[in-house]
Amino acid sequence: MAGERWQAEGPGEGWAIYVTPRAPIREGRRRLDPRNGDSSDAPAYGAHPSRRGRREVRFSEEPAEVYGDFEPRAAKERSPGGRRTPPEKFRPASAGEEVRESAYNLRSRPRRQRRAQEAEEMKTRRSARLEQHSQQPQLSPATSGRGLRDSPSSSEDREEDEPSSRPVTSQTASKKTLRTPEASVMNEDPISNLCRPPLRSPRLDSTYQTNGNTKTNEREATIVQQVNFFEEGETEDDLESSYSDITIRARSSDSLESRDEATPAAGNHPDSLRGLPHNQDFPAHENQPLLLTSGCQENPQEWVDRAVRMRSRMAYNNIQKSNFGNQSPSTSRPQSAIHHPNEPSVKIKWWLLGLVAILAVGLFWFFHTPAVETTAVQEFQNQMKQLQSKYQSQNEKLWKRGTTFLEKHLNSSLPRPQPAILLLTAAQDAAEVLKCLSEQIADAYSSFRSVRAIRIDGAGKAAQDSDLVKHEVDQELTDGFKNGQNAAVVHRFESLPAGSTLIFYKYCDHENAAFKDVALVLTVLLEEKTLEASLGLKEIEEKVRDFLKVKFTSSSTASSYNHMDPDKLNGLWSRISHLVLPVQPENTLKAGSCL
């Protein structure tokens, strides 16, 4: 049978006597080829007759010792004599065996009994190594709790009685030695390196499951290997030479997977993995000294202190890493936002600062300009009150309507929509009052700027050429307004040449005027000797219009672009007649002087 041991060969065969051959292939009943579409386990049609069909393999709960269709691993190792041992041939099955199915269960082989000489030699080496380390002081419970799983005496009994079918020893039976620096770093106890790990229930180990995780098994098998197994005939030199040929895999091939994969392994080996970080591996290098060897050369007390420090440092690092791993992304994002300021926030702050500056300038301009205008209006009102106190014979409508009209123009927003045009008229008895009052009203308008109003005398230009007068009037008004003067007075408007008056289209054309922030005061002296005070403003306006029409238009004057005609006069009148106010004579006014 597959589980029975074959008889040993001659003494020269070496390890071949301990090789368990693969179970023989038993032939059952032959099956017909699936020619008609039926499915069976028979070989395909046309296959070679010597090729047997596939077998169904069922795995038992015990670890498997048969490795499929290849040779046993022990058969590939070299024998002590230096030659390779050929694999054993399987003996034929007896005729009386009953072939039930083309399936069988894989069973672990029974442990072999050591020969007396071999067991005595291994005990001698082990006892010598135990005596070498028995002089070291006893470790603290915290130190020995992780490293010493069993006492040295129990480890011997466990090594003798433990089945050889453990996954760790069965997978590495062909190795000369297994010296793991990782186990030394984790346990840091020289005595624990001589102790075999405790027996584990084969039902709880995922290595024995057919659908188990091979990555976890590989990690477990690597970490559990803490004992140095010495084969027959090897020496200490062989151990040191074979140390450089072994690479310990402390983690699975895919170590970047989630930590949940490493948690079950840590549960199976709590003493081995508790102090080891998940993402830390310890590859064994050729020049790296063993912790056990260095510990034997140093003082035992120093070695114990170093082991305690290394263990506490590894535990502290593991706590830090676990805390960082358990931190949620929502907690880590605000920290990164604190260390690294957000650039859009800085830009928004700069934009806000610029906006505040613009608003400050706008508010300053908004509040400053009305304050200036308010001061100008107040100054104008004060001047008009003084004039009203001086010229007491004037009609109340003159002060009320004139002050309101010019004050409204001063309060209008900048730029103002149109200039302020005021026309004053009087009879022959109030000629001196008309001249003085018109100039003082214009000066009151520009009193805030402390400048004198522009003065143009029409009576002095009556005999001059119309074009020349027009040019002179235009030049005086333009220069004065450009130089900061905002008021002008034109005396004796009716005395100007008729054609020259067309220049006032430029300065009085409402929204199309050349200068809109100015005030013009025009005076017209009627031919009548006295002007009745009972006349209304409408009647006075008609009197002035009819007088200018007679003055500027005549049938003998040729019609041309530079000569006045009724149509042009009507257009000019509509532009200069915004407000027409009468002026009455003053008894206190002396000739040649103003009040």
From Swiss-Prot:
Disruption phenotype: Mutant mice exhibit perinatal mortality, typically dying on the last prenatal or first postnatal day. All tissues tested exhibit nuclear membrane abnormalities with membranous vesicle-appearing structures observed in the perinuclear space of neurons. Residues 133-143, 204-215, 319-335 have a biased composition (Polar residues). One of its GO terms (cellular component) is nuclear envelope. It comes from Mus musculus (Mouse). Residues 1-351 are nuclear. GO terms for biological process: nuclear membrane organization; positive regulation of ATP-dependent activity; protein localization to nuclear envelope. There is a cross-link at K321 (Glycyl lysine isopeptide (Lys-Gly) (interchain with G-Cter in SUMO2)). This is Torsin-1A-interacting protein 1.
